[in-house]
């Protein structure tokens, strides 16, 4: 099980992992909000590996006694994603410009506060002296859902992870507006082995390896932990 913000990464590296481990025939992924996945694992859903987009959600699983090992392998920061079809394109320059007071009628989405991407957004809004109520017109259960709505033009903009915005912008699916370091926030990415299997350990070792981390940082815009 893995945070939805890792979907593009795992799709990209899956063949490389299998080539390096020919005895493993395949990997099955289940993506969603880290908080939702953590609750499922604690409640007994079967999984061999958990990749979380926050320390808090990983601790939920760890404190329930479900983890055999936990490693921090990357971190991410927030970014404003703008729909390429938005009439507000060019007028969205900072957090304040996401409000109706600056851009009347603008439609903005955030992840729900219980999801790591929503918690990250809350910290950014607080740092910018703003609030969720002043910005959000709708809430998404995961960053994947929020990104899709922005790309399709259902929303003008939203606060997502830098890695997701970079991936979309490189493909002409969105535009990115950087959030200043003084206002921005970070979230850590953690991997946990949940079952005592040699194959599971090989997969965890791969995520902690230099090749995977280099791909994360160079190709997808994640940061070193």
PLM regions and their residue ranges:
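Exported/periplasmic ABC-transporter solute-binding proteins
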Residues: 1-22, 28-30, 35, 39-43, ...
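Short active-site segment of divalent metal-dependent hydrolases/proteases
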Residues: 51
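Central helical "cap/lid" subdomain
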Residues: 65-71
């Amino acid at each position: 099980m893995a945070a939805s913000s890792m979907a593009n990464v795992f799709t990209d590296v899956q063949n490389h992992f299998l080539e390096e481990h020919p005895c493993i025939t395949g990997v099955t992924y289940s993506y969603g909000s880290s908080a939702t996945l953590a609750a499922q694992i604690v409640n007994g859903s079967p999984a061999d590996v958990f990749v979380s987009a926050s320390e808090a959600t990983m601790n939920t699983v760890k404190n329930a006694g479900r983890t055999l090992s936990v490693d921090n392998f990357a971190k991410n920061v927030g970014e404003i994603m703008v729909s390429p079809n938005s009439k507000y394109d060019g007028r969205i320059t900072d957090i304040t410009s996401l409000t109706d007071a600056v851009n009347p009628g603008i439609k903005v989405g955030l992840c729900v506060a219980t999801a790591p991407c929503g918690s990250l957004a809350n910290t950014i809004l607080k740092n910018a002296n703003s609030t969720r109520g002043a910005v959000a017109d709708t809430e998404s259960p995961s960053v994947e859902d929020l990104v899709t709505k922005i790309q399709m033009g259902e929303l003008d903009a939203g606060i997502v992870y830098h890695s997701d915005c970079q991936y979309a912008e490189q493909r002409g699916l969105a535009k990115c507006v950087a959030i200043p370091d003084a206002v921005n926030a970070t979230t850590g990415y953690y991997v946990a082995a949940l079952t005592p299997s040699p194959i599971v350990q090989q997969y965890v070792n791969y995520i902690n390896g230099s090749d995977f981390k280099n791909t994360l940082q160079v190709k997808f815009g994640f940061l070193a932990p």
